[in-house]
């Protein structure tokens, strides 16, 4: 068993894609399509570059393990991709790669985040051994394109004058999450959209959507309502607006929430 100093991005993407299709190996931060994974690794993975953010373990010249850290250099934190391991001595390989990658990152990472399928028992045990704290459990819902287009009252794309209210609500509802309010504003683009529900110039709620048309991928990243606007149908209207927007893209068939 050895770690190679020469990394091949296509090999990494292919290995993760195959492993991530299996619930017992699944990591929620990454998909299971090779081309999409390769694009993410090369263009949207880790502030320190993908080469410094992965370790790959081999045995008899075959990959048996991949571990990646999607590093945020400013926050000194990382989302954990893996460990993806195809070996009998799973824990031994996992701890070996963890040690190697920790030493490879050029600074101390203060916080790690894991997001694993409920059937991924190996990674759950590893997190426990590393003294990780479980923050919560989440369901991923998939919606198919059967939505009719219609006008939704009081919901529209966020304008700059609403950003301050949005940041305050978002940071209050999600105090320790992967994107703070100002980071979401910075990520807005022709495809990444923030929709808000307003009443009397007050923010009732919002939904933030990211779309990658190239891979026909869409995610509703955040949805929340202000405390005094709950149980009034605001969340439902926001969700409808987000779904309609996503399915307005040609070829979009399903959404993950």
Question: For each of these PLM feature ranges, what is it?
Answer:
Residues 1-39, 138, 148-177:
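Short amphipathic alpha-helix that is part of the acyltransferase structural core
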Residues 31, 36-96, 207-226:
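Conserved donor-binding loop and adjoining core beta-sheet/short helix segment
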Residues 37, 151-218:
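Flexible, substrate/cofactor-facing loop regions flanked by secondary structure
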Residues 90-103, 225, 231-244:
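Conserved acetyl-CoA-binding loop-helix of GNAT-fold acetyltransferases
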Residues 105-117, 246-257:
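Conserved GNAT acetyl-CoA-binding A-motif
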Residues 118-136, 236:
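Conserved active-site alpha-helix within GNAT-family acetyltransferase domains
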Residues 133-145:
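Conserved catalytic-core motifs of GNAT/GCN5-like acyltransferases
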């Amino acid at each position: 068993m050895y770690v190679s100093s020469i990394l091949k991005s296509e090999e990494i993407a292919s290995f993760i894609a195959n492993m991530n299709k299996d619930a017992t190996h699944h990591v929620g931060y990454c998909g299971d399509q090779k081309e999409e994974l390769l694009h993410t690794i090369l263009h949207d993975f880790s502030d320190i570059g993908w080469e410094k953010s992965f370790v790959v373990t081999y045995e008899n010249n075959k990959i048996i393990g991949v571990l990646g850290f999607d590093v945020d250099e400013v926050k000194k934190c990382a989302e954990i991709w893996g460990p993806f391991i195809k070996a009998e001595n799973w824990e031994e390989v996992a701890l070996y790669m963890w040690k190697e990658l920790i030493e490879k990152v050029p600074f101390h990472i203060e916080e790690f985040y894991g997001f694993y399928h409920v059937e991924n028992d190996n990674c759950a045990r590893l997190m426990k051994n590393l003294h990780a704290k479980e923050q919560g459990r989440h369901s991923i819902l998939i919606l198919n394109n059967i939505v009719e287009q219609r006008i939704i009252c009081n919901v529209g794309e966020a304008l700059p004058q609403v950003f301050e209210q949005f940041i305050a609500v978002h940071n209050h509802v999600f105090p320790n999450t992967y994107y703070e309010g100002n980071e979401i504003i910075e990520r807005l683009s022709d495809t990444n959209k923030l929709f808000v529900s307003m009443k009397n110039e007050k923010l009732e709620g919002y939904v933030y959507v990211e779309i990658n048309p190239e891979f026909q991928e869409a995610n509703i990243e955040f949805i929340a309502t202000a405390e005094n606007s709950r149980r009034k149908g605001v969340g439902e209207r926001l969700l409808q607006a987000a779904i309609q927007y996503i399915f307005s893209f040609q070829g979009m068939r399903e959404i993950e929430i």
